[in-house]
């Protein structure tokens, strides 16, 4: 028995903030943003719309798509950096709102790599037989911690949530390998400043991301006994098109094997990889027996990579 994906779901706020909107808010341009990041627009949550609202909507859809009910869920794991409070956790809030009376809940925090940490954590519970059905959510409302006076970072971030239901699958499907890591010495390069807004040293973060995402991708391939050409789809953290393209080139993959959503969502941190995965499923980019590589990096500094073989 292995742990695989049974259903997916997403939620993005209605409001779209385009690069042209940002031109009216700060000294920037659509051309400057697109050429450096690949971002054209991002979603922004309402003031009265919170991270747990985004997570709830995505989880609800994922459970329905898995053909399950909330009472079938044993555990909720939410990856986020924008909890409204230290406690209760976002996972506990959505567990209550969904009426999932049989489920436990906990949040995990590894910034933009958080979803990969959540997936790997869920897989361990399933593979040991401790739990059967686990909802893993990546959700963030980055607009509330964005410094809108810093054009270098304000143009990057958006809000949203992606969710999956994980459960038992056959031994030759599901999670084939993973690589999680941290380099705490780099925490000074990406963090919340004294005003609780995002600070980023873009140059240092770029170097870290390109190096670690590439190396982690090669490690999970080796651990899964796969070659680069065995990969059917690469879903990287949607931070910056240049970082994403560097990851693709490191693996010698053709352009069509790179999943891109950065243009329409921007960088949504914990939900970035999850949203891209859900879009890939909805667009028919993933079919049974496909080998899918998820890889990301985040504040901490952290990184996570994993390979899933699609299907049951």
Curated annotation (Swiss-Prot):
Cellular localization per UniProt: Cytoplasm
**Which SUPFAM superfamilies does the record associate with it?**
Thiolase-like
Is Cytoplasm one of the keywords? Answer: yes
Region (ACP-binding) location: 238-242
Give the residues annotated as active site: 112, 237, 267
What Gene3D superfamilies does this protein's entry cite? 3.40.47.10
- What is said about the domains? The last Arg residue of the ACP-binding site is essential for the weak association between ACP/AcpP and FabH.
Q: Which NCBIfam families match?
A: fabH, PRK09352.1
Q: What does this protein do?
A: Catalyzes the condensation reaction of fatty acid synthesis by the addition to an acyl acceptor of two carbons from malonyl-ACP. Catalyzes the first condensation reaction which initiates fatty acid synthesis and may therefore play a role in governing the total rate of fatty acid production. Possesses both acetoacetyl-ACP synthase and acetyl transacylase activities. Its substrate specificity determines the biosynthesis of branched-chain and/or straight-chain of fatty acids.
Per its record, how is this protein called by name? Beta-ketoacyl-[acyl-carrier-protein] synthase III
* The gene coding this protein: fabH
């Amino acid at each position: 028995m292995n742990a695989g994906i049974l259903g997916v779901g997403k939620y993005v706020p209605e409001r779209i903030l385009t690069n042209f909107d940002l031109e009216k808010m700060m000294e920037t341009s659509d051309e400057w943003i697109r050429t450096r990041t690949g971002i054209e627009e991002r979603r922004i949550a309402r003031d009265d719309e919170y991270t747990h609202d985004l997570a709830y909507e995505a989880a609800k859809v994922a459970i329905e798509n898995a053909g399950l009910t909330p009472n079938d869920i044993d555990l909720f794991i939410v990856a986020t950096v924008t909890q409204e409070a230290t406690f209760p956790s976002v996972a506990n809030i959505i567990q209550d709102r969904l009426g999932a009376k049989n489920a436990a809940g906990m949040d995990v925090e590894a910034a933009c790599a958080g979803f990969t940490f959540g997936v790997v954590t869920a897989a361990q519970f399933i593979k040991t037989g401790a739990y059967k059905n686990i909802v893993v959510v990546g959700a963030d409302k980055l607009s509330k911690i964005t410094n809108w006076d810093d054009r270098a970072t304000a143009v990057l971030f958006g809000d949203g949530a992606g969710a999956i239901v994980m459960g038992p699958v056959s031994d030759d499907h599901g999670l084939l390998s993973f690589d999680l890591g941290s380099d705490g010495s780099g925490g000074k390069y990406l963090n919340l400043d004294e005003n609780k807004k995002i600070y980023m040293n873009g140059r240092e973060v770029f170097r870290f991301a390109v190096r670690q995402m590439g190396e982690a991708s090669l490690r999970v391939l080796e651990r899964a006994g796969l070659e680069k050409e065995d990969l059917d789809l690469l879903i990287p953290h949607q931070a910056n098109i240049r970082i994403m393209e560097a990851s693709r080139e490191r693996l010698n993959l053709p352009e069509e094997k790179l999943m891109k959503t950065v243009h329409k969502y921007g960088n949504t941190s914990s939900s970035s990889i999850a949203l891209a995965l859900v879009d890939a499923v909805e667009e028919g980019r993933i079919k049974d027996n496909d080998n899918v590589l998820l890889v990301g990096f985040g504040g901490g500094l952290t990184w996570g990579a994993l390979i899933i073989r699609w299907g049951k």
